[in-house]
Amino acid sequence: MIEYLPFDKRVPDTQYRDLLLRILTTGEEVPTEHGVSALKVIGHAMRFPLANGFPVVTERDVAREPKNGKRPSLFHQALGELCAFLNGAQTQQDLEQFGCYWWDPWVTAEHCEKFGLPPGDLGPGSYGAAFRRFPTAEGTPFDQLRHLIEQIKERPDARHHELSPWIPQYVLTGHEGGRRVVVPPCHGWVHVHVNSRARTLTLTHRQRSADAPVGLVFNLIHYAALTLMIAQVTGYRANELVYWIDDAHIYLNQLEDVRVMLATEPQRLPTVTLDPAIADLFAFRAQHFAVRDYHPRLPRRRIATPV
């Protein structure tokens, strides 16, 4: 559950735009493996008290449904992606069944072949596999996520409610066997903190790499939503999302779009609610989320991101 402040009592949140501005003004220009240089900063923290609103960026519209109606909004695609990974999705077909359609450029036959994967397969080192089928020395995959929820319910005061997307042998290169994932996990290091006395739940999230104008927009949706979801199924009130980024960057071909977004006025964050009838984390779907009080300053716009 979550208790939002009335919309007119919320304070406009500038943390996302502050990060964009920091990268623009102090970022170091570096080469990347994508062939496009980037400005980057190392180490950035944000804290979102969820009573002040759900962190959906207002610098551009991500919740408007496409005019053709064939696919969900970007907001609901992000939620579909989250629900897919929470259920162990590993292929583009799996993701599309949950309503996420943006993985196509990373799962082409040519790209997958580089890592010994069939077309459409994100690989055994991807998020869904790590969350639900983490490999073990004993040979039996370990379901991190299910055990995490059970542990929160059984031992709420424990300090090790943690989740990791990182399976080193499938991600790191330079070892026998090679990489087995189309994109090394950029996000997904989660630590859940429960105050059993106050009945509140805070989630801290670490992201190793953030494409600030594009990927980060949807990652903020992911982990704010996950905070609400875990709180609902374990019986706590969602309190705060604490967000840490190791490497935050803007590609040089995104600079014009970023400057346009920064020219907008800061807005209050919207209200996002969940279907209160859902009591199983793995039963959530994108359609169980509703957004209101969302007032973006720019229409939906496509921003380049290297593959």
Predicted segments with their positions:
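Terminal, non-catalytic protein-protein interaction segments that mediate quaternary/complex assembly
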Residues: 1-307
